[in-house]
Design a protein with these regions (language model features):
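Signature of multi-pass transmembrane helix bundles
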Residues: 1-76, 237-241
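Hydrophobic alpha-helical segments of integral membrane proteins
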Residues: 1-15, 40-47, 77-81, 85, ...
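Buried hydrophobic positions in well-ordered alpha/beta secondary-structure cores of metabolic enzymes
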Residues: 8-9, 94, 119, 171, ...
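Membrane-interfacial loop-to-helix junctions in multi-pass transporters
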Residues: 12-17, 53, 70-77, 109-116, ...
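Transmembrane alpha-helical segments of multi-pass membrane transport proteins and ion-pumping complexes
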Residues: 18-22, 54-63, 67, 92-96, ...
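Small-residue-enriched core segments of transmembrane alpha-helices in multipass membrane transport
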Residues: 44-61, 80-85, 156-169, 179-184
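Helix-loop-helix junctions within the multi-pass membrane cores of secondary transporters/permeases
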Residues: 86-166, 236-238
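Transmembrane alpha-helical segments and their short flanking loops
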Residues: 136-241
Length: 241
């Protein structure tokens, strides 16, 4: 399974890096030709919304998880995990961040190596909080901007689809935006306006993907701390040092 995952990740990275710029350029050219430069204004609202949601989850949700589920002070975690988040931001790849994440969780957060060795690789492909958040907001942005009616039921379905899709998202740069298309197709958001909105997301989503990766790898580290605490395999002296 691990070898297959690596092959898929390498293949997606190659395809995205090689062909995505040309595809995005063609889509944007058509977008600006039809709607003009004003079509970028709604996209800015999408960017701001995603950034606020990601930072809120990072600085509010994770500390709450650590305090309530692991019964530890979240300040040492946030301080020590900062370099993991920064590395994830710069590489935009959970797979590339895995060695540093494992080293940090074991040596600085006091997580037993057995826990880190199991939780972190699993979380790299399953625990995709940031990806799910981005895909939900992006799908709603596409729906609203392309004239589809968004109801509470449709939002719930989008959230479920995003959760399922994020679990299988490969740990490769830009993969989240590619998987987003499956959600849009599943919801039936496939008219011309929806495709144009999706092209805007592809064009501006690189910094968003970097923040998403930071959130994902931080979530993996937080989960390993919680699991280690539950299994009584967390060295709290190292954690609080």
């Amino acid at each position: 399974f691990e070898e297959v995952s690596k092959v898929i990740s390498l293949f997606l990275t190659f395809v995205i890096n090689k062909f995505a710029p040309y595809a995005i350029f063609c889509l944007l050219t058509r977008t600006f030709a039809i709607y003009g430069i004003d079509s970028l204004k709604p996209a800015l609202a999408y960017v701001v919304t995603v950034i606020i949601a990601l930072f809120a989850y990072l600085f509010i949700a994770y500390p709450i998880y650590l305090m309530t589920m692991a019964r530890v002070n979240p300040k040492p975690f946030m301080k020590k995990a900062a370099k993991v988040a920064l590395f994830g931001f710069s590489t935009s790849s959970s797979a590339a961040t895995l060695p540093l994440n494992r080293k940090t969780t074991v040596e600085e957060l006091g997580v037993h190596d057995q826990i880190a060795s199991f939780v972190l690789p699993l979380g790299m492909t399953v625990n995709m909080d940031g990806t799910a958040i981005m895909q939900v907001i992006a799908a709603m942005f596409v729906a609203v901007s392309s004239g589809y009616k968004v109801t509470f039921m449709s939002m719930a379905i989008i959230a479920i689809l995003a959760l399922i899709a994020s679990i299988g998202t490969p740990a490769a740069p830009g993969a989240g935006a590619v998987i987003l298309f499956t959600i849009l197709t599943g919801m039936g958001y496939t008219n011309d306006a929806a495709l144009l909105a999706y092209s805007l997301i592809l064009a501006i989503n690189r910094p968003i993907e970097m923040l998403v990766t930071s959130l994902n790898v931080t979530g993996d580290a937080a989960t390993s701390v919680i699991v280690a605490k539950k299994e009584k395999m967390l060295d709290e002296e190292i954690y609080h040092s």
